[in-house]
A protein has these predicted regions:
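Generic beta-strand structural signal
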Residues: 19-20, 29
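Short strand-coil-strand connectors
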Residues: 21-23, 46
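Short, surface-exposed, low-complexity cationic segments
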Residues: 29-49
Length: 74
């Protein structure tokens, strides 16, 4: 998996799920009450909202690692 793959998934709003060290992580999407869309990423049922692909790549973590650093291993 590459950053381009994740970018493509986000553009299509395609959900993605993977297991890392026995924990399930998700990438999906949500809207707030005003209609603003968010990317949701994190452990299953504990996802955090990110405003954009850039925000996700700069801040999303899997345990003590940035998500972007683990992509090639997925």
């Amino acid at each position: 998996m590459t950053k381009d793959d994740i970018y493509f998934y986000i553009q299509l709003k395609k959900e993605f799920e993977f297991v890392f060290k026995g924990k399930t992580y998700i990438l999906n999407y949500d809207k707030d009450d005003s209609g603003k869309e968010f990317i949701v990423f994190g452990q299953l049922y504990e996802g955090k909202r990110f405003e954009s692909y850039g925000d996700l790549m700069n801040h999303a973590k899997v345990e003590n690692h940035f998500f972007r650093e683990l992509l090639e291993d997925l």
